[in-house]
């Protein structure tokens, strides 16, 4: 599908487009859920949507439904695969933990649970936004409040939701997920960024992975190597389905740890040490895409997994302020 087949003009900017076949059933349509989430946070003030990509427009053609949004850089999963943990400064990892956690806090503020927190669903910003980490992929999101503002009563039984490596223990038990579960998934993800040896259930069956997660929470309650893990594990383990998670408690655990390690959390995000930094001559595009870290965002992002149906315009993007453009149909 050409990006301008609906009659849009092409300009010199780039956006991202997510598509879905129009005949997808209402129950299987994740794009509509994503659109609802994006419309919800678009109404928030700037501070509360710092970690969300901007919704540019949405519509449908005879075959496709589509959403156009601001473009982002590589995902944390891609960066984890590309660089060794020793290449990433501790300050960057801790700031990554804080930003990804703040994104969850803001997501809950608009009334939704994400339910699929993992490194692949976080991306660093593109170009001038590369100091910001964005949360993406809201296809499994669910409202957790009723119209009167009360937390929805839990359903007696649900199915396992999320990615087995990072999903919460409640998801393994097929229980209704609450705000605590997004944070528990975030915790597994954060641990995996700090100390990859602790997440040792890759490739195991679901029951065995659940048992390993239970063991990890028990272990971390007396874990002295990274004291912040001890604080966070104890706090999260005491929450129940409808608990309101105190973001400040988790943030303070990380900032206290940084202070004890004499780390500043105001340095630029750097995804590898300068000794391994590619020179401009061997990293085309870095000057235009990422000044501080010299990451070639375009080359990494072009390898992104196709399962997310994320398409980039090679020549530009849609322009919505051309009076000659015909208005797309909505969905």
Curated annotation (Swiss-Prot):
PANTHER family for this protein: CASEIN KINASE-RELATED (PTHR11909)
Catalyzed reaction equations: L-seryl-[protein] + ATP = O-phospho-L-seryl-[protein] + ADP + H(+); L-threonyl-[protein] + ATP = O-phospho-L-threonyl-[protein] + ADP + H(+)
Name of the protein described by the UniProt record: Putative serine/threonine-protein kinase ZK507.1
Taxonomic source organism: Caenorhabditis elegans
Annotated family: Belongs to the protein kinase superfamily. Ser/Thr protein kinase family.
Region (Disordered): 302-331
Record-listed E.C. numbers: 2.7.11.1
GO biological process, one term: signal transduction
SMART domains, sorted: S_TKc
Protein kinase domain ranges (all copies): 1-270
Pfam family, one: Pkinase
Top-level lineage group: Eukaryota
Biased composition (Basic and acidic residues): 302-314
Molecular-function annotations in GO: ATP binding; protein serine kinase activity; protein serine/threonine kinase activity
Lineage: Eukaryota, Metazoa, Ecdysozoa, Nematoda, Chromadorea
Active site: 116 (proton acceptor)
Keywords (A to Z) from UniProt: ATP-binding, Kinase, Nucleotide-binding, Serine/threonine-protein kinase, Transferase
């Amino acid at each position: 599908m050409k990006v301008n087949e609906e009659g849009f003009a092409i300009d010199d900017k780039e956006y991202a487009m997510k598509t879905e076949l129009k005949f997808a059933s209402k129950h299987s349509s994740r794009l509509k859920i994503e659109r609802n989430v994006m419309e919800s946070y678009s109404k928030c003030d700037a501070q509360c949507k710092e970690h969300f990509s901007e919704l540019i427009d949405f519509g449908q053609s005879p075959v496709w439904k589509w959403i156009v949004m601001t473009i982002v850089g590589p995902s944390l999963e891609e960066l984890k695969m590309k660089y060794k943990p020793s290449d990433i400064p501790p300050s960057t990892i801790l700031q990554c933990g804080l930003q990804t956690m703040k994104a969850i806090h803001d997501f809950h503020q608009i009334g939704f649970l994400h339910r699929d927190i993992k490194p692949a669903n976080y991306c660093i910003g593109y170009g001038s936004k590369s100091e910001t980490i964005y949360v993406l992929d809201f296809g499994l999101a669910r409202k957790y409040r009723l119209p009167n503002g009360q937390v929805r009563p839990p359903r007696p039984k649900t199915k396992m939701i999320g990615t087995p490596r990072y999903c919460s223990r409640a998801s393994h038990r097929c229980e209704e997920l609450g705000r605590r579960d997004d944070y528990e998934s975030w915790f597994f993800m954060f641990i995996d960024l700090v100390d990859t040896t602790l997440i040792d259930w890759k490739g195991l069956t679901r029951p065995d992975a659940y048992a390993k997660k239970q063991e990890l929470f028990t272990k971390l309650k007396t874990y002295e190597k990274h004291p912040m893990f001890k604080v966070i594990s104890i706090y999260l383990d005491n929450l129940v389905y409808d608990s309101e998670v105190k973001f400040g408690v988790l943030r303070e655990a990380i900032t206290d740890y940084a202070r004890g390690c004499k780390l500043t959390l105001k340095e630029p995000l750097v995804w590898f040490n300068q000794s391994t930094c590619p020179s401009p001559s061997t990293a085309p595009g870095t000057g235009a895409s990422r000044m501080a870290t010299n990451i070639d965002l375009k080359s990494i992002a072009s390898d992104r997994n196709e399962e997310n149906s994320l398409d980039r315009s090679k020549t530009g993007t849609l322009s919505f302020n051309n009076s000659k453009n015909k208005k797309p149909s909505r969905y």
